[in-house]
Amino acid sequence: MTDDEVQWKPILVGGLSGLVAETLVFPLSTIITRVQSSLSFQQAGGFQHLYRGLSSVLVSTLPSASSFFFVYEYAKARQKPGVRNHLVSASVAEVVSCGILAPAEVVRQRAQISKTSVSQIFQSMIHNYRDLWHSFKGMCGRNVPATAFQFVLYEQFKKKFSATDHVFGAPKGAALSGAITAAVLTPLDVIKTQINLRPESYRKVVRRIYKENGIFGFEKGLGLRVFASSLGLSIYLGTYEHVKSHLHIRKAGEVSVA
């Protein structure tokens, strides 16, 4: 298989890894959404129905995760190795992924804090395309810098940990990079969550959060996000790297043995 040929294995493995990780950490995602909403935790649903909205995510996770790894691996193979490679590749891949994931993210988060069915939320959203545009911008505003930063850290940590631990090097690197990224970028996640739940401009959301809760309003769910991101990314990328190695999927620039 040449460098110019489409490699279906990373695409498939990336999609399936995303499904596994999303399903396992979804209850934590629900709790974080309810903590970060403008409602009280109990008003938003408390600890009830933690898997509400999962169907919309599962439908979109496979194509979004698959497209991410397709673009990421493709871009990596066409640049010189290094930090800039990982930064650019992850950023471009995440923009593509967000275009697929944004509608499902709106449905998921609205379903997580209300009793409205997924189908009803989806139907109302179709008639208000601006909600999707706001969601896409908010998601890109959070996910692109987060993913770029995260993958730069991940590639470095993975290389370091894998030198002494071939089995758990990737999960360890993913967990650490996920925790650091979540801690740094929680304010963007809070803003994105509130845009999805109550469509407003970025500026209005920032002003409202600060007015209602001060500077600490941007750190809602910090501890939960660090834990969930660390766990989720460890499962996601750990599974991806593990299955990829067993399928003999080559790295950029290596000769395929599949």
Swiss-Prot record:
It holds the Pfam family Mito_carr. Solcar repeats lie at residues 9-78, 81-160, 165-246. The keyword Nucleotide-binding does not apply. GO terms for molecular function: S-adenosyl-L-methionine transmembrane transporter activity. Keywords: Membrane, Mitochondrion, Mitochondrion inner membrane, Repeat, Transmembrane, Transmembrane helix, Transport. Its main location: mitochondrion. The keyword Membrane applies. GO terms for cellular component: mitochondrial inner membrane; mitochondrion. It is found in: Mitochondrion inner membrane. GO terms for biological process: mitochondrial S-adenosyl-L-methionine transmembrane transport. The chain crosses the membrane at residues 11-31, 53-73, 87-107, 139-159, 171-191, 218-239. It is a multi-pass membrane protein. SUPFAM superfamilies: Mitochondrial carrier. Belongs to the mitochondrial carrier (TC 2.A.29) family. This is Uncharacterized mitochondrial carrier C1271.11. It comes from Schizosaccharomyces pombe (strain 972 / ATCC 24843) (Fission yeast). The lineage of its organism: Eukaryota, Fungi, Dikarya, Ascomycota, Taphrinomycotina.
